[in-house]
């Protein structure tokens, strides 16, 4: 546990989850509120850019694996390394089991749920420290580096990112299997057609219209070596290693009462990202049922939550901001490459940021200073050192 001591003069905001979205909420509110951030790890471990994470882990960790002690804006907040076990919405309290086994009940004036969701081996809610994080990162990258043939099952952004980055790195025969005619469901049709061409140009062997039979009880939380069976009638396929990116997202919401969850376990929210019936509770990111694509993590949902928490604290519940999601997904799919960073837009257009500009300006200035509010230099004990 670390951070500032609470002040009774300021509202207490508990931020459940300090991932990509929760971290931005916590750092924005820490100046005007007593923020308590609760996270299952002692560092930001981003779920973004899995392809770069597996093929260029040193580059990836500089931006996406950062101990919380390096975030200057968290100096004003308190962080608890542990897991929320329950929430009493009437008493305005969360129960936390810390990593050392200690139990603490934390009261709140406002609760922001940003606990994310599990998906494959790269996104989970296990309570772990930096050594375990580093071991998992090295193990996954090592398995892929040793494989001569890799099958990636799933044509979403994660599967596409892994397949293309592996093929670009070279030395591996990469096969991408997806159930539809084109990859990237949820993206604009122009983006989907472009990506299908791009994958083939980069050397990925693309297999459309293949729907895998997922073994009973398997959640994609490990890479496998068994033959892949298909419900669409094709012959089984065997690779040295198979990475599963077939969706099956599981929200981290078991600590919440069922009354605030939808049928899939995601947190129900209104247009202001508030939980209906509980105006002091907000949800944002992958755990929030904010729109059909549950895209508030990528569409500046944190800004809506921050503005609305501030408005509520000021007694201005009538002027809350509304969250609006575009029809299609957008953003960087492949991550930073030798020729730069390609960003696709909701309208199907795309633009490229040259690498010479992306590294110092996008990651060095925009991410480090604007989004994160400044980082302390890494030390020898930090993974990004």
Regions found by a protein language model. Name each.
Residues 2-4, 335-385:
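C-terminal auxiliary extensions adjacent to catalytic cores
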Residues 2-78, 164-190:
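Beta1-alpha1 glycine-rich phosphate/pyrophosphate-binding loop at the start
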Residues 37-59, 114-143, 342, 356:
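Glycine-rich active-site loop/strand segments that organize a redox cofactor
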Residues 130-148, 236-301:
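FAD-site-proximal beta/loop scaffold in flavoenzymes
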Residues 269, 284-336:
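A conserved FAD-binding loop/helix module that cradles the flavin
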Residues 19-22, 156-160, 302, 306:
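Catalytic nucleophile loop
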Residues 2-16, 74-151, 232, 243:
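FAD-binding core/adjacent interface of flavoenzyme oxidoreductases
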Residues 74-94, 106, 171-269, 317-320:
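A Rossmann-like FAD-binding core segment of flavoenzymes
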């Amino acid at each position: 546990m670390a951070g500032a001591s609470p002040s009774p003069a300021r509202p207490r905001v508990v931020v459940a989850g300090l991932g990509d979205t929760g971290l931005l909420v916590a750092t924005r509110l820490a100046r005007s509120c007593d923020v308590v951030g609760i996270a299952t790890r002692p560092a930001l471990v981003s779920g973004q850019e899995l392809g770069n994470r597996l093929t260029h882990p040193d580059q990836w960790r500089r931006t996406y694996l950062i101990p919380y002690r390096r975030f200057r804006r968290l100096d004003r907040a308190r962080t608890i390394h542990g897991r929320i076990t329950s929430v009493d919405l009437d008493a305005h309290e969360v129960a936390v089991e810390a990593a050392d086994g200690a139990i603490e009940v934390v009261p709140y004036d406002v609760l922001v749920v940003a606990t994310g969701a599990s998906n494959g081996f790269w996104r989970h809610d296990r309570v772990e420290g930096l050594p375990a994080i580093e071991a998992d990162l090295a193990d996954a990258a090592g398995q892929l580096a040793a494989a001569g043939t890799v099958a990636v099952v799933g044509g979403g952004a994660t599967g596409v990112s892994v397949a293309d980055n592996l093929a670009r790195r070279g030395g591996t025969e990469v096969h991408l299997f997806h159930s539809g005619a084109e990859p990237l469901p949820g993206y604009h049709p122009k983006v989907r057609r472009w990506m299908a061409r791009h994958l083939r140009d980069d050397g990925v062997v693309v297999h459309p219209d293949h729907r895998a039979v997922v073994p009973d009880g398997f959640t994609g939380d490990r890479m496998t070596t068994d033959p892949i069976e298909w419900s669409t009638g094709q012959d089984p396929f065997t690779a040295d290693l198979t990475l599963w990116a077939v969706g099956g997202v599981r929200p981290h919401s078991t600590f919440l009462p069922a009354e605030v969850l939808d049928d899939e376990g995601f947190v129900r929210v209104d247009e202001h990202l508030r939980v209906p019936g509980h105006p002091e509770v907000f949800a944002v990111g992958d755990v929030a049922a904010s729109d059909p694509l549950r895209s508030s993590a990528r569409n500046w949902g944190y800004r809506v939550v921050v503005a609305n928490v501030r408005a509520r604290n000021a007694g201005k519940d009538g002027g809350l901001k509304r969250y609006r999601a575009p029809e299609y997904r957008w953003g960087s799919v492949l991550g930073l490459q030798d020729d730069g960073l390609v960003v696709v837009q909701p309208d199907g257009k795309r633009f490229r940021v040259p690498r010479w500009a992306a590294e110092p300006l996008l990651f060095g200035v925009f991410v480090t200073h604007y989004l994160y509010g400044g980082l302390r230099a890494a030390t020898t004990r930090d993974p990004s050192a």
